[in-house]
From Swiss-Prot:
InterPro entries listed in its UniProt record: BMP_lipoprotein, Peripla_BP_I, PnrA-like
Protein name as catalogued: Basic membrane protein B
Family: Belongs to the BMP lipoprotein family.
Alphabetical UniProt keywords: Cell inner membrane, Cell membrane, Lipoprotein, Membrane, Palmitate, Signal, Transport
Highest taxon above the source species: Bacteria
GO cellular component, one term: plasma membrane
Stated role: May be part of an ABC-type nucleoside uptake system involved in the purine salvage pathway.
């Protein structure tokens, strides 16, 4: 369940003006730990590019940047974060919801280090430390647009969704997508499965081939490297088999098969928050979550201009005329109350 959220515009005017963490120092070291692999052609790649861009744009502020990757267990995350601390890091970014628990423990243990985390999943009763800022995305809003397009474009009337490991973030993709599809066409058939992996390309390909064999002609995925297998399956099958990507524009991997990608501009968000920190004498007031969505320009679709008809739907979401569900409970309410199904 989501905790109380602070809107981006309000936060950026206040969160850097309070308690100082190592304020006024000269050049600093910024580090990042991602869950999985750095070059995942998606989520982590976007964050890593942002870190390198910060180093280029703020040479007078940044001494050095570090990037590291880990996967699997809590102890591994904490060990890697400790290594980044020992490297002299002043600001450490954690990328991926699997690092949620680690973000709390390391920030509490190291109050003089500033921490940021992308896509944390905290329970309602968690008190976020003052040196920790979380960034979450209303990714269900972008997925809703993708589902709407998929339902309109499908020839067979059957579309699919493949998620990685089931959890709040992946479910937001799924239920936003399903809600958008049903909003466009109440009769659309939707099949959703989970690969239980963010790294197994072969399982992604196998699930996609099974779906395509059953007449599904469009698959949206949010599965990390397993999603590469979905792309490969569509590419091998050729025309008439389509995919919708996740996190960043992946259309170059299969131009003839891509409809669009649900964009989560992880890099832009990381860059924005970090640049504000640098511009404000390295002052970092945490204890808050920043929520970003369509309104902030960090969630949306690649090649959005290709789908002019979707702009009406986008405006309704931004104006809260459509409240997009991000979990199963919200989806059931959406279906019953909004669509009367």
């Amino acid at each position: 369940m989501r905790i109380v959220i602070f809107i981006l515009g309000i936060l950026l005017t206040s969160c850097f003006a309070g308690n100082e963490i190592e304020s006024g120092s000269s050049k600093i070291k910024i580090s990042m730990l991602v869950d999985g692999v750095l070059d995942d052609k998606s989520f982590n790649s976007s964050a890593n590019r942002a870190l390198l861009r910060l180093e280029e744009d703020f040479p007078e502020n940044i001494e050095k940047v570090f990037s590291s990757a880990a996967s699997g267990v809590y102890s591994s995350y904490v060990s890697d974060l400790d290594n980044l601390k020992m490297n002299g890091s002043d600001l450490i970014w954690l990328v991926g919801y699997m690092l949620t628990d680690a973000s709390l423990s390391v920030s509490l243990e190291n109050p003089k280090i500033s921490y940021g985390i992308i896509d944390p999943v905290y329970s309602d009763d968690v008190q976020i430390p003052k040196n920790l800022i979380g960034v979450v995305f209303r990714i269900e809003q972008g997925a809703f647009l993708a589902g709407y397009i998929a339902a309109k474009k499908s020839v067979s009337g059957k579309i699919g969704f493949i998620g990685g490991v089931k959890g709040d973030i992946v479910d937001a993709f799924r239920y936003g997508y399903e809600a958008g599809a049903k909003y466009a066409d109440k009769g659309i058939e939707i099949v959703s499965e989970y690969s239980n992996s963010f790294s197994d390309v072969n399982i992604g390909r196998a699930i996609a081939n099974k779906m395509y064999a059953k007449g599904i002609d469009i698959i949206h995925f949010a599965a990390g490297l397993a999603g590469i297998g979905v792309i490969e399956a569509a590419k091998e099958l050729g025309d008439g088999y389509y995919v919708i990507g996740a996190d960043q524009d992946q259309s170059h991997l299969a131009p003839r098969n891509f409809i669009t990608s649900v964009i989560k501009n992880v890099g832009d968000a990381l860059y924005l928050v970090t640049s504000e920190y640098l511009k404000n004498n390295n002052t970092w007031e945490g204890g808050k979550i920043i929520q970003m969505g369509l309104r902030d320009g960090v969630v949306g679709l690649s090649n959005a201009n290709k789908f002019e008809y979707i702009k009406v739907i986008e405006r309704k979401i931004v104006n809260e005329e459509i409240i997009v569900p991000y979990n199963h409970e919200g989806y059931e309410i959406f279906i019953k109350q909004i669509l009367k199904l």
